[in-house]
Amino acid sequence: MPKGRQKVPHLDAHLGLPICLWLELAIFFLVPQVMGLSEAGGLDILGTGGLSWAVHLDSLEGERKEESLTQQADAVAQAAGLVNAGRIGELQGHYLFVQPTGHRQAMEVEAMRQQAEAVLARHEAVRWHSEQTLLKRAKRSIHFNDPKYPQQWHLNNRRSPGRDINVTGVWERNVTGRGVTVVVVDDGVEHTVQDIAPNYSPEGSYDLNSNDPDPMPHPDEENGNHHGTRCAGEIAAVPNNSFCAVGVAYGSRIAGIRVLDGPLTDSMEAVAFNKHYQINDIYSCSWGPDDDGKTVDGPHQLGKAALQHGVMAGRQGFGSIFVVASGNGGQHNDNCNYDGYANSIYTVTIGAVDEEGRMPFYAEECASMLAVTFSGGDKMLRSIVTTDWDLQKGTGCTEGHTGTSAAAPLAAGMIALMLQVRPCLTWRDVQHIIVFTAIQYEDHHADWLTNEAGFSHSHQHGFGLLNAWRLVNAAKIWTSVPYLASYVSPMLKENKAVPRSPHSLEVLWNVSRTDLEMSGLKTLEHVAVTVSITHPRRGSLELKLFCPSGMMSLIGAPRSMDSDPNGFNAWTFSTVRCWGERARGVYRLVIRDVGDEPLQMGILQQWQLTLYGSMWSPVDIKDRQSLLESAMSGKYLHDGFTLPCPPGLKIPEEDGYTITPNTLKTLVLVGCFSVFWTIYYMLEVCLSQRNKASTHGCRKGCCPWAPRRQNSKDAGTALESMPLCSSKDLDGVDSEHGDCTTASSFLAPELDCPPHQPPDLLQGKSGQIC
């Protein structure tokens, strides 16, 4: 045996191990108890089991020192047969009395409880006491019985945590879109599906194709009129009904405007954008011009006016929120800046990424894209699970919704969550919050650039991925941005040739401080460029805009399928890549021809620059960024914290009317009848005047002119002094009448009394027949 180590007498190996274990257990229980009796730290251990009472000693705050209160607490606890475990947190005069340790029978424990209650109830130093019981608390989490909810990876991605819209934490705080109405402008909404029916808003719905209030989709040969119903389910599908799936804003109301299932006119589009705009808060539009890589189109005159009117007067003056899809023409090399809905300053343009955060094959790029959210990708990746129609081949649920058509409704639902916590967000507030909170992420296809204001943007993903948690927390403390300021340059006549690559045409325009003084514009939001260019092949043109900071925007990307020979006629491109930068400085428009064919050179005829922004300074933007980041912990996201909202404007609902073919036919018939009646009336008046010019008389008979008429003329007698017409009554007695009425006076009362004929024409005539 090694020196220094001796065997303890009578301690065999088979007894040593149990004894050591008993010693360790004794130390484990006794040491915390001793520590707990001397300080409040023991509260955590002794207060979790056995009998315990919270006791408030009768002493006013600040009147007695903590030492004396502790001594008094020890004495009261001892009198009750308990042990003072220390002060409860930071509550002065509040102590926890616990049952002394030791195993006791049930009857003994009950006797101790009664004794303690009796002592504490009658002790003069005890103001209040309460026996502590175990409270049932659970970590807040969301559980739905909807069978397809586990497959809704875009809401809660369990396979790849973090690759979702981060909405469950918002739901746990009871933010579900309550009080907000989202309308899906599409091919109809089957509102009788059980996932939609409880949240359906008939007040915000309409069918512009059939001109009735019910937007129910109509079956078609291609079984394709389920698009609007799927979008509606993404937004507001009802949870916990044991059917299909859950919507992003499942507490919101959902409406439908059926407009895409038939011929569409500019007037119908205008009506759709403003239909029930005091009821509907958000307009979700998953449609646009053809995504064929060769179309340049957008809202026409009435549609543009309706968008502008919506953001000015909709939602009691806070502005309707228009969410549009960026388009699915990626496989055709299309670009969403050729889509007038996607590059409008009045819309929120949303693109798509797949489950892995990559840009799908169908997604379009553009400088006007605001943000992206999740959708389906290729066949190996999961698509969006949502409600479906149950007409024709539909089952009421689908796992195959995809495209930017699926991304835009998710964004609309997240905006509904924002409006619940801050109903007075303006349409520009929503855009700003998206810019401030979108998350940049790595994608080898993305060309991320950080602008002068610190915002990162890519043509593929806008300012980044929408995050519901960040959006809602930012909305909770958001105060409105200043009024919209704008600057429009004069129409700049150029008439310069566009050279072929690698050469380029560069034109400049300097925006000075004086130019911006009247509007107060300091920092940018949207920048628009309107160009007129002739070119034999429009798709060969490439247009880039450089802001004063040097931030480049590819506003007009080349398109291989666009062979239109007419060029651009006053087409407006836009960019948001200069958001937050200073407005003053030199703007450069660079145009080049990247085509390979030896065609005639294009001509830049004219262009115009339009700046949109506010009087915010760069410092104001930095301060707002810091404020929002401080709110991302969720500390403001509770009902107790609410910023005051200004009252909205009282704007009456103005029902629009669509010119349907039957209505147009009716108007044509009424118009033709009106023209016929007008011609008849004019002929009647002309004939009446001609008859009066040849005849003059009175209603009751002959009207011989008195001989003194000539004398009156010679004497200069006034017109009103001329004698009245005379006629003979039934007795043959001459009488004068002051009422000269003709048969035509009923049609032309202003011609009742024709002018008197000259006396020389009356010579030789004894009278005229009426």
UniProtKB/Swiss-Prot annotation:
Widely expressed. Expressed in brain, lung, muscle, heart, liver, kidney, spleen and thymus. GO terms for molecular function: peptidase activity; serine-type endopeptidase activity. The active site is at 186 (charge relay system), 227 (charge relay system), 405 (charge relay system). Residues 195-228 are annotated as: Disordered. Residues 480-617 form the P/Homo B domain. It is found in: Golgi apparatus, trans-Golgi network membrane. The chain crosses the membrane at residues 667-687. Residues 152-472 form the Peptidase S8 domain. Residues 688-770 are cytoplasmic. It is an enzyme of class 3 (hydrolase). The record marks 140-141 as: Cleavage. Residues 1-36 form the signal peptide. It is a single-pass type I membrane protein. Its cofactor is Ca(2+). Residues 215-225 have a biased composition (Basic and acidic residues). One of its GO terms (biological process) is protein processing. Inhibited by zinc and copper. Pfam families: P_proprotein (PF01483), Peptidase_S8 (PF00082), S8_pro-domain (PF16470). It comes from the Eukaryota. Residues 37-140 form a propeptide. Its EC number is 3.4.21.-. Serine endoprotease that processes various proproteins by cleavage at paired basic amino acids, recognizing the RXXX[KR]R consensus motif. Likely functions in the constitutive secretory pathway. PANTHER family: PROPROTEIN CONVERTASE SUBTILISIN/KEXIN-RELATED, PROPROTEIN CONVERTASE SUBTILISIN_KEXIN TYPE 7. This is Proprotein convertase subtilisin/kexin type 7. It comes from Mus musculus. The gene is Pcsk7.
